[in-house]
C-alpha cells in the first residue's frame, strides 16, 4: 500500500481539507441606483447568488483588501454596479413614468431655488455686515485724526513760544560759526504726528489665484485681529452619501464656482475701496501739512536746525524716522514699484490711448442758381451716392448729372448738416449793369409813352391811324393786330408822344402785360356799341398791376346803337369812375372813323403827362431800353424794336440785350428812316444783334465788347441749364404711380416758327391752352424766321407737325417734308391756327361708346324646345325689339344676364324687329334660365365722336 500522505501536486479530494471551510451566504440582497440621461435616478433591488468559497485569514475579499481607514473608497467600490456574470440572472430596470419624472424635476428645481435664495441672503447679510464695520472704522479713524491734529497744533504753538523766548534770552552769536551755537539753544521739537489708521480686518489666507490688488494693506501697528478670521473657501457641507448623476454634479460644481467667484469679486472690490479711501486720506493730510507749515522767526542757528517746520530727522510728512518706520516705508516703496510697469515707462503714469472717430466737418456750401448732383456732392465733400440716396428718400429719382434748382440744393445741404450760402451770379451782373441814381441837374423832360389797349375789334389801331394820319389797319392780316407796334407822333404843338399798339386777342396776354410795364399812360379803348368785354377787363387789371393811370377813349360814338353812358356805368363797376360822376378817370368820346374827339384826346394825354412830370437823363447816362419786338429778317439778320428809356443810344454802341449782345450797325425810326441816335422815349429798330432776343429783354450799353460777350454767354448757359432742369425734372415716385394708374397721355408734337418773337410766345401759349384728359399739345421747338431743313428733320425725328405763322418754308425744307411725308401748315391769322390744331386733336381722340335703349318686352310663357333650349313667348310693351340688338334680362329690376339675341320670330317666320303691342318668340344665346314675368330690355351700342369742349 502506498502512503496516505498525498503529494504536493495531488489534486484529489482528501478527507482532511487543506483549508478550513467557511459557510457564507450564497444569496445576498442589495440595491443599485439606476441613472437616466435626463437627470433622474432610481434604486433597484438586486439579489446576488454566490458559490461556496474557501477563505484563508488575511485573504482578499472580492478582489481587494478591506481598508478600515478608507471607508469612502470602499463605499464607492461597493456601490459600483457589477456586471452580471455569464449564467447569472439579468434584471430588467423599469424606467420612470412621466409623472415621476415631472415630480422629480419639480423637486430638484425647488431645491435649487432654495439654495440660490439662501446663498443670496447670506451674501447680502455678509455685505451689510462688512459695510457697517467699514463705516464704524472710518468714523473712528476720523475722530482719532481730528484729536491728533488738535494735539499737534497745540504742540506746534508751544514750540514756537519756547523758541521765541530762547532766542530773546540768548546772546547774539557770531555769524561765522552757527554750528557751535546750535547746541546751546534748546529747541523744542514738536512731537511727531501719528495719524491713526483704521485697523483693517485680519488678513485672510490668500490663495494663489487672487490678484495683486487683493492683498491687504499693512497695519500701522501690530494688533490683534478685531474680527474672527474669515476663510475665502468656506467648508462645503458634505453631501448626503448617495450617488449623484453627472448632470447634477456639473450643476453643483457650477454653482459652487459661481459662488466662489462672486465672493472673491466682492472681497476684491472691498479691498480696492479701502485702498482708495486710504490714499485719499493720506493726500488730504499731506496737503494740510503743507498748508500749515509754521514760519518761525529764530536765530541763524535755529534756522539751520528748523527747516520748513520740521526737524532734519523728520520725513516729508512730518513724522520721525524709526527702524520700523523705515522698514514699512521701504516695504511700501517696493510694493508700489512692483505695481508699476517695467522699463522707462515706470517713471510715467500709464497712458491708455484710444482710437477716436474723427469729428464731423461742417462746411459753408456755396449754391448757385442751378447745380448738378455731382457738383453739389463735391462741394459738401461727400459721395454722390449719399446725395442720390437722400433725394430718393424724399421721393426724387435723380442721376449724378441731374440739374437741381437752388431751393432743392439748399434743402439737401441743410439735411446733410452743412450751412448753405445761396449766391446769384445773375444778381451780380445786374448790379454791374445798373448805373445807379441820376443827378437832379442832369434830368430833362421826355415824351410820354402811351399804350393803347382794349378788346379786339374795338378800333385801337384805327384810332392810332387817325392820330398818325396813316393806314396801318389795311395791311394787317384778318383786320386784327398781332404784333406790338411802336410809333412816335409829333403833334401840331410840337410835342411828341410815343404810342404802343398792343394786340387785343386773348392769345396776346403776354404782349399786353409787357406793354403795360414800359408805359406811362394807358389809353383804354372801348367800343360804345359793344361795351366792356373780357379783354377790356384784362387790360384794366394789367394797368392796375403796373400802377399806370388810365384814360378811357369811348370809340365808335358815331355808330348806330352806341351807348356811351352804358360804357361808363360798366367801367364804374370795375373801379374806373368818370370825372363827371365825381371820380378821377378821364373819359373822352372819340370816333376814329370821322376824327371826332382826337384833338381832345391828345390834349388830355399831354395834361396827364405833365402831371406825371416824366424825366430822364439823355446825356450823362449809358443807354438803357426795353425790347418791344424782335424778328429775323432775311437780308438784315436779327432785328429788334427797342424803346429807349434812359440815356442816348447811338450807332456803334456795344450793348447787352438779354442773352445776346450787339454792336449797333444801324438805327431806323418807326417810319423806316435811318437815324444816328435815339433819345429817351423814342422807338427804334436795331440792326447788328448776335441773335434774336426775347421780347421784354433789357438793353444796356457797355464799354467793353469782351465783357458783353461774357455776359451774353453766361446768360445763355444759365438759360440752357434752366431749360434742362425743366425738361428733365427729377422723377417723383408719386408721379410714376399716377401715370401707371391713369395710363400715358397721348401728345401732339408741334414745331412752331413765326415772324417775330412776340407772335411765337402768343401762338405757343394758345396751343398749350388746348387741353384734354386724353391728349395734349406739346410744343417741342419754337423759333423766329422761316421753316428750314433742320426744322423738318426735327419734325421727322419726333413725329411732329410743322406750323409756320406769317412765315414760309424754303425749297430744301419743302423737298424734305415731301419725301418724309411731314405735314407743313402755314397761317396768317391765329384764329385759323388754333381751330385747325383743335380739329387735329379731336381726330386723334378715340370715340366713346354710348348705349341706346330700343324697347322692352315681357315674358308671358317659356317653351322648352329640343336642341334649341328655352324660348320666351314675349309681348313687346314699348319701343321695338331688334334682331341685331342686345338683351338685358331684368328680374324684379335686377339684371341677371346680358347677351345677344339668338333668334327672333313672329309665329314661324324670322323677323328683323317686332314693334310695340305685338307678340314674338325670342331665343337668348347661352342662357336658358328665363322665367315668366321677366322683362327683356333691348339696346344697341353706338360710337360717338369726342370733342375738346
From Swiss-Prot:
Chief place of localization: cytoplasm
SUPFAM superfamilies in the cross-refs: Initiation factor IF2/eIF5b, domain 3, P-loop containing nucleoside triphosphate hydrolases, Translation proteins
Annotated segments matching region Disordered: 54-183, 217-288, 305-357
Region (G5): 591-593
Record localization: Cytoplasm
Compositional bias per record (Low complexity), positions renumbered to this chain: 165-183, 217-228
Superkingdom to which the source organism belongs: Bacteria
Single GO term (MF): GTP binding
Sequence ranges assigned to domain tr-type G in this UniProt record: 445-619
Region of interest: G3: 501-504
A single Gene Ontology CC term: cytosol
UniProt-annotated stretches for the region G4: 555-558
The keyword Cell division belongs to this UniProt entry's keyword annotation: no
Biased composition (Basic and acidic residues): 67-92, 101-164, 235-288, 330-339
Region G2, residue ranges: 479-483
Residues bound to GTP: 454-461, 501-505, 555-558
Family according to the record: Belongs to the TRAFAC class translation factor GTPase superfamily. Classic translation factor GTPase family. IF-2 subfamily.
Function: One of the essential components for the initiation of protein synthesis. Protects formylmethionyl-tRNA from spontaneous hydrolysis and promotes its binding to the 30S ribosomal subunits. Also involved in the hydrolysis of GTP during the formation of the 70S ribosomal complex.
PANTHER family the UniProt entry points to: TR-TYPE G DOMAIN-CONTAINING PROTEIN, TRANSLATION INITIATION FACTOR IF-2-RELATED
Name of this chain's protein: Translation initiation factor IF-2
Source organism: Magnetococcus marinus (strain ATCC BAA-1437 / JCM 17883 / MC-1)
Gene it is expressed from: infB
Amino acid at each position: 500500500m502506498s502512503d496516505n500522505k498525498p503529494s504536493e501536486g495531488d489534486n484529489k479530494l482528501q478527507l482532511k481539507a487543506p483549508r478550513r471551510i467557511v459557510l457564507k451566504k450564497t444569496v445576498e440582497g442589495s440595491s443599485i441606483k439606476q441613472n437616466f440621461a435626463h437627470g433622474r435616478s432610481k434604486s433597484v433591488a438586486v439579489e446576488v447568488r454566490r458559490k461556496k468559497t474557501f477563505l484563508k485569514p488575511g485573504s482578499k475579499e472580492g478582489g481587494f483588501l478591506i481598508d478600515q481607514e478608507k471607508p469612502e473608497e470602499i463605499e464607492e467600490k461597493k456601490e459600483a454596479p457589477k456586471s452580471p456574470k455569464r449564467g447569472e440572472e439579468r434584471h430588467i430596470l423599469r424606467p420612470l413614468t412621466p409623472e415621476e419624472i415631472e415630480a422629480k424635476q419639480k423637486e430638484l428645481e425647488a431645491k435649487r431655488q432654495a439654495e440660490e435664495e439662501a446663498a443670496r441672503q447670506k451674501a447680502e447679510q455678509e455685505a451689510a455686515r462688512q459695510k457697517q464695520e467699514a463705516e464704524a472704522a472710518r468714523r473712528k479713524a476720523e475722530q482719532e485724526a481730528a484729536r491728533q491734529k488738535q494735539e499737534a497744533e497745540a504742540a506746534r504753538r508751544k514750540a514756537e513760544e519756547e523758541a521765541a523766548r530762547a532766542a530773546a534770552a540768548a546772546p547774539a552769536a557770531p555769524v561765522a560759526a552757527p554750528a557751535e551755537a546750535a547746541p546751546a539753544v534748546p529747541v523744542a521739537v514738536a512731537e511727531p504726528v501719528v495719524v491713526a489708521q483704521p485697523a483693517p480686518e485680519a488678513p485672510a489666507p490668500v490663495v494663489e489665484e487672487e490678484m495683486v490688488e487683493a492683498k491687504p494693506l499693512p497695519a500701522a501697528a501690530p494688533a490683534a485681529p478685531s474680527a474672527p478670521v474669515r476663510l475665502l473657501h468656506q467648508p462645503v457641507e458634505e453631501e448626503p452619501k448617495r450617488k449623484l448623476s453627472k448632470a447634477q454634479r456639473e450643476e453643483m460644481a457650477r454653482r459652487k464656482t459661481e459662488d466662489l467667484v462672486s465672493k472673491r469679486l466682492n472681497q476684491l472690490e472691498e479691498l480696492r475701496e479701502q485702498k482708495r479711501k486710504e490714499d485719499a486720506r493720506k493726500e488730504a493730510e499731506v496737503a494740510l501739512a503743507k498748508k500749515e507749515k509754521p514760519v518761525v522767526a529764530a536765530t541763524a542757528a535755529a534756522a539751520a536746525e528748523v527747516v520748513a517746520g520740521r526737524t532734519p530727522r523728520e520725513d516729508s510728512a512730518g513724522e520721525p524716522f524709526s527702524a520700523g518706520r523705515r522698514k514699512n516705508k521701504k516695504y511700501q516703496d517696493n510694493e508700489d514699484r512692483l505695481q508699476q510697469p517695467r522699463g522707462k515707462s515706470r517713471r510715467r503714469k500709464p497712458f491708455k490711448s484710444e482710437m477716436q472717430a474723427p469729428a464731423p466737418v461742417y462746411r459753408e456750401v456755396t449754391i448757385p442758381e442751378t447745380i448738378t448732383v455731382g457738383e453739389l456732392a463735391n462741394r459738401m465733400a461727400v459721395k454722390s451716392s449719399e446725395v442720390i440716396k437722400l433725394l430718393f428718400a424724399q421721393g426724387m429719382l435723380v442721376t449724378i448729372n441731374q440739374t437741381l434748382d437752388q431751393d432743392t440744393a439748399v434743402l439737401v445741404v441743410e439735411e446733410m448738416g452743412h450751412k448753405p450760402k445761396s449766391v446769384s451770379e445773375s444778381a451780380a451782373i445786374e448790379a454791374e449793369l445798373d448805373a445807379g441814381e441820376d443827378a437832379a441837374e442832369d434830368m430833362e423832360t421826355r415824351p410820354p409813352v402811351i399804350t393803347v389797349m382794349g378788346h379786339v375789334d374795338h378800333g385801337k389801331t384805327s384810332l392810332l391811324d387817325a392820330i398818325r394820319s396813316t393806314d396801318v389797319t389795311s395791311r394787317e392780316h384778318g383786320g386784327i393786330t398781332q404784333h406790338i407796334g411802336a410809333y412816335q407822333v409829333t403833334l401840331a404843338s410840337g410835342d411828341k408822344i410815343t404810342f404802343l399798339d398792343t394786340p387785343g386777342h386773348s392769345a396776346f396776354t403776354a404782349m399786353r402785360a409787357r406793354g403795360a410795364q414800359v408805359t406811362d399812360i394807358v389809353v383804354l379803348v372801348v367800343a360804345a356799341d359793344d361795351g366792356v368785354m373780357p379783354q377790356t377787363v384784362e387790360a384794366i387789371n394789367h394797368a392796375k398791376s403796373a400802377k399806370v393811370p388810365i384814360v378811357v377813349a369811348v370809340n365808335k360814338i358815331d355808330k348806330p346803337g352806341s351807348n356811351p353812358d352804358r360804357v361808363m356805368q360798366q367801367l364804374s363797376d370795375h373801379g374806373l369812375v368818370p370825372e363827371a360822376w365825381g371820380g378821377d378817370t378821364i373819359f373822352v368820346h372819340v370816333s376814329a372813323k370821322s376824327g371826332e374827339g382826337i384833338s381832345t384826346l391828345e390834349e388830355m394825354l399831354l395834361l396827364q403827362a405833365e402831371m406825371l412830370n416824366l424825366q430822364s437823363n439823355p446825356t450823362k447816362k449809358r443807354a438803357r431800353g426795353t425790347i418791344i419786338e424782335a424778328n429775323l429778317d432775311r437780308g438784315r439778320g436779327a432785328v429788334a424794336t427797342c424803346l429807349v428809356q434812359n440815356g442816348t443810344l447811338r450807332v456803334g454802341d456795344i450793348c447787352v440785350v438779354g442773352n445776346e449782345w450787339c454792336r449797333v450797325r444801324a438805327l431806323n425810326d418807326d417810319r423806316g428812316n435811318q437815324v444816328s441816335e435815339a433819345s429817351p422815349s423814342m422807338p427804334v429798330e436795331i440792326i447788328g444783334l448776335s441773335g434774336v432776343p426775347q421780347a421784354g429783354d433789357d438793353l444796356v450799353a457797355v464799354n467793353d465788347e469782351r465783357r458783353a460777350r461774357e455776359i451774353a454767354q453766361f446768360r445763355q448757359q444759365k438759360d440752357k441749364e434752366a431749360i434742362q432742369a425743366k425738361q428733365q425734372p427729377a422723377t417723383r415716385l408719386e408721379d410714376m404711380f399716377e401715370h401707371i394708374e391713369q395710363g400715358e397721355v397721348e401728345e401732339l408734337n408741334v414745331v412752331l416758327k413765326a415772324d417775330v418773337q412776340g407772335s411765337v410766345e402768343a401762338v405757343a401759349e394758345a396751343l398749350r391752352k388746348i387741353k384734354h384728359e386724353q391728349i395734349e399739345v406739346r410744343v417741342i421747338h419754337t423759333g423766329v424766321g422761316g421753316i428750314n431743313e433742320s426744322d423738318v428733320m426735327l419734325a421727322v425725328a419726333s413725329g411732329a407737325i410743322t406750323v409756320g405763322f406769317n412765315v414760309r418754308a424754303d425749297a430744301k425744307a419743302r423737298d424734305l417734308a415731301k419725301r418724309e411725308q411731314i405735314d407743313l401748315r402755314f397761317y396768317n391769322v391765329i384764329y385759323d391756327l388754333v381751330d385747325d390744331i383743335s380739329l387735329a386733336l379731336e381726330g386723334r381722340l378715340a370715340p366713346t361708346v354710348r348705349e341706346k335703349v330700343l324697347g322692352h318686352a315681357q315674358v308671358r310663357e317659356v317653351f322648352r324646345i329640343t336642341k334649341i333650349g328655352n324660348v320666351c313667348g314675349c309681348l313687346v310693351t314699348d319701343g321695338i325689339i331688334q334682331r341685331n340688338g342686345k338683351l338685358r334680362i331684368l328680374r324684379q329690376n335686377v339684371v341677371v344676364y346680358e347677351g345677344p339675341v339668338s333668334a327672333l320670330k313672329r309665329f314661324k317666320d324670322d323677323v328683323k324687329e317686332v314693334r310695340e303691342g305685338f307678340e314674338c318668340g325670342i331665343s337668348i344665346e347661352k342662357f336658358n334660365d328665363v322665367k315668366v314675368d321677366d322683362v327683356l330690355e333691348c339696346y344697341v351700342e353706338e360710337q360717338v365722336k369726342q370733342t375738346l369742349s
